[in-house]
Swiss-Prot record:
The organism's taxonomic lineage, starting at the top: Bacteria, Bacillati, Cyanobacteriota, Cyanophyceae, Synechococcales
Name assigned to this protein: Phosphate import ATP-binding protein PstB 2
Membrane topology field: Peripheral membrane protein
One Gene Ontology term, aspect cellular component: plasma membrane
Domain of life of the native organism: Bacteria
UniProt EC number: 7.3.2.1
Protein family per UniProt: Belongs to the ABC transporter superfamily. Phosphate importer (TC 3.A.1.7) family.
Gene: pstB2
Binding annotation for ATP: 45-52
Occurrences of domain ABC transporter (ranges): 13-260
Organism: Synechococcus sp. (strain JA-3-3Ab) (Cyanobacteria bacterium Yellowstone A-Prime)
Subcellular location: Cell inner membrane
Subunit structure comment from the entry: The complex is composed of two ATP-binding proteins (PstB), two transmembrane proteins (PstC and PstA) and a solute-binding protein (PstS).
GO biological process: phosphate ion transmembrane transport
Length: 265
């Protein structure tokens, strides 16, 4: 596993020897990396290497999985994300997540976006929040005349942008994306990628993707994870983390080169 200190001035997350267990089974081991602010970081690697597991550590959604536990150090703006006094719900407000399959609520488009601010009791103008969030998610022009329609009636690409708008409505600092385009057609995928490039001006974005071309197109930084057999268990580990152009053009690890050149994984 390679640990690199990258010359960035501001980090949102820093991990040190991070291990994730499911029950007694080690799922990912010894992950040490720094996630820079206002950049897009891509996690790539074969299935089962721990990309999504590590992503879920950043907003503590692993807490929702029975038997899951995290060891090691993970800080968010310099503060221990797993300290006893930290409220996981507050963490998830600041660190939003967009999942692989679009998952709009069975509510109107308006109520999907307004849901978070309502639940959190945010003292905001909901009409303004809904409009602003939908505009930021590049969806407003397509839905502004049908806000009362069910969000699940939208196309797959529109539903995913609605989920992004829903995440933006609670004013997050970070957006996590777990394979956000895997269920979408190429045109919808391109729109999501264009949207990411716009959003990174104001948000830190981390994306898990199996699509190497996508990682190369959208990300500033790339972390390559792989799998090691430990006894009968498959354990994920971070192999290399660097600027995306380095990972794809001149990686220092042979395993990284083999993966990005299509010889493995």
């Amino acid at each position: 596993m390679q640990t690199q200190s990258l010359n960035q001035t501001s980090y949102v997350f820093r991990t040190e020897n991070l291990n994730v267990y499911y029950g007694s089974n080690l799922a990912v081991k010894n992950v040490t990396l720094d996630i820079p602010a206002r950049q897009i970081t891509a996690f790539i690697g074969p299935s089962g290497c721990g990309k999504s597991t590590i992503l879920r550590c950043f907003n503590r959604t692993n807490d929702l999985i029975p038997g899951a536990r995290v060891e090691g150090k993970l800080t968010y703006h310099g503060k221990d994300l797993y300290a006893k006094e930290v409220d996981p719900v507050a963490v998830r407000r600041r660190i939003g997540m967009v999942f692989q399959k679009p998952n709009p609520f069975p509510k109107s488009i308006y109520d999907n976006v307004a849901y978070g601010p309502r639940v959190l009791g945010m003292k905001v103008d909901l009409d303004e929040v809904v409009e602003t969030s939908l505009k930021r998610a590049a969806l407003w022009d397509e839905v502004k005349d049908k806000l009362k329609e069910n969000g699940q009636s939208l196309s797959g690409g529109q539903q995913q942008r609605l989920c992004i708008a829903r995440a933006l409505a609670v004013q997050p600092d970070v957006i996590l994306m777990d394979e956000p385009c895997s269920a979408l057609d190429p045109i919808s995928t391109r729109r999501i990628e264009e949207l990411m490039k716009e959003l990174v001006q104001d948000y830190t974005i981390i994306i898990v993707t199996h699509n190497l071309q996508q990682a190369g197109r959208v990300s500033d930084m790339t972390a390559f994870f792989s799998v090691e057999l430990v006894g009968s268990n498959r354990v994920g580990e971070l192999i290399e983390f660097d600027r995306t152009e380095v990972i794809f053009n001149s990686p220092t690890k042979q395993a990284t080169r083999d993966y990005v050149e299509g010889r493995f994984g």
